[in-house]
Amino acid sequence: MYEILMYMNTIMFFCMAVSFTYGVVRFFKKGKALYLQMIVCGMGCMMLSRAYHVITLLTTGVLTEGFHVGRLGIMGSFLFFLCANYGQVDKLLDDGAKENRKYRIIPLVAPVLIWLGYQMVLFGVTTVENKVVCGVTAALIMFASYFNLKHLIFPDVEFGFIRNIRNYNLIALILAVLSIGEMIFLILEWIVPLVILYIMMCVVSLTMIPVLERGVKKWTI
């Protein structure tokens, strides 16, 4: 298990480092939207989380459970994703009109599924500290996934603002599912599903920022 975790976390670190560096080069310029920069910062947090995992595996040979810098990085990443979608987009998109009520209710499916996934952690064989830390992480993933799904199905506004970032929101939603899946598979020690999940996470990490950039280039505002 050590070799697999070591190899996969190293590969994921480099994938996330490439994505983060690309985002910094493309979006951290004068006149670029804060929304884009916050998403890049979220990817940076994930990169730091994987760096911590690699260092921990090299020095101790195991992944530490409970609260640590790696877990804090995951929390930070989804907090950035949440703030980007809620603070920078949702307040402009949803004015609270009654006709849009169903687009506020349907996205609850995402956090409910994340919560159900967390039950496998809650009732799994792990420490109480790890259950609490995973619970806090899952809560942030739940909130972030709600807005990802909401912006995936919400009717477009004029200028194609929401339509052009739907692909990004789909990828971010997949990342949320993969992140809760990683918690589950690590506790259950399911090696093959974990490797498949890590490969998918590499693909998602590499494509997220370029897909976002391609979408925002179509904004006409």
Question: Each PLM stretch: what is its role?
Answer:
Residues 1, 109-133, 187:
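Membrane-helix boundary elements
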Residues 19-29, 54-65, 69-104, 115-122, ...:
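Internal transmembrane alpha-helix with an interfacial aromatic "cap," most often the third helix
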Residues 30-45, 96-107, 158-171, 220-221:
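Membrane-interfacial loop-to-transmembrane alpha-helix junctions, especially the N-terminal start
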